[in-house]
Amino acid sequence: MDCYLRRLKQELMSMKEVGDGLQDQMNCMMGALQELKLLQVQTALEQLEISGGGPAPGSPESPWTQLEPPQWEGSRGPVRPGACSPSNQASLGSTSSGKFPSHRSVCGRELATPPRTPLPEPQPSAQQGPELAEPDDWTSTLMSRGRNRQPLVLGDNVFADLVGNWLDLPELEKGGEKGETGEAGEPKGGRGQPRELGRRFALTANIFRKFLRSVRPDRDRLLKEKPGWVTPTASEPRAGRSQKVKKRSHSKGSGHCPFPGASEPRRGENASTGCPKALESSPSGFDINTAVWV
């Protein structure tokens, strides 16, 4: 009986030693996992710093100082005994609480962190200045810089307006010739080629402008000659139009103008003279040729 009791006591002591070893191994493994998580956070922060070109919004030291490996004292798991030696456990206990070296041994294995190059953080922030305030929001800044002008109204033909304004500009052939004759005494060193290019560009622009003016009638000239022109058919003879209006008015037997927007003629006037006057007195603000000529 005494021999059996001694064997039981020895087995209990060995079980206690094995339990202590398992607890140390569990603490070792949990510390290694916590260090791996912290290394992942550190690499993610470094990638953000490299991609953003400046310091990340959260300081990289905050997760290192706040997060500490928990002491799993009361937990025991199925870990193989003898996996960690006491020297490795002591080295882990000394290194898992503070800063992390580049190489450390965990349970007989070496965790090697990738070599990191030091990033010059304060230099780009001092050079770029306010541009680093929102490194990820560069699209909004680009849109705000490009959209300072007023928005365009739907249906507005901007290209037609630009070309129309360019056609309305006076020609600069005479001014260019005068400038060339006045500056003929200067040496033709480096200014000869740009001047020749400018003259050729002006000639081609004037030719293109004349062609477009032949397609689209000159608005100012037509307004001076015929102040009441509205439609492209304004060049028709007035006599034929008045005869048509006379026939329509006689066939209907009433003195009103066939156009619904025209006012009724007075008693002393005929229907034939009322309708052309209404056409001539219509406002010339909207010009269908200048609006839809492209």
UniProtKB/Swiss-Prot annotation:
One MF annotation (Gene Ontology) recorded for this entry: protein kinase binding
Bias (Basic and acidic residues) ranges: 171-198
Intracellular or extracellular location(s): Nucleus
Segments passing through the bilayer: none
GO CC terms: nucleolus; nucleoplasm; nucleus
A Pfam entry, by short name: FAM212
Region feature (Inka box): 134-177
Biased composition (Basic residues): 241-253
Major subcellular location class: nucleus
Disordered, as annotated region: 50-143, 170-198, 223-290
Bias (Polar residues): 85-99
Domain notes: The Inka box (also named iBox or inca box) binds and inhibits PAK4 by binding a substrate-like manner.
UniProt similarity note: Belongs to the INKA family.
Subunit structure: Interacts with PAK4.
Annotated function: Inhibitor of the serine/threonine-protein kinase PAK4. Acts by binding PAK4 in a substrate-like manner, inhibiting the protein kinase activity.
Protein name stated in the entry: PAK4-inhibitor INKA2
Originating species: Bos taurus
Gene responsible for this protein: INKA2
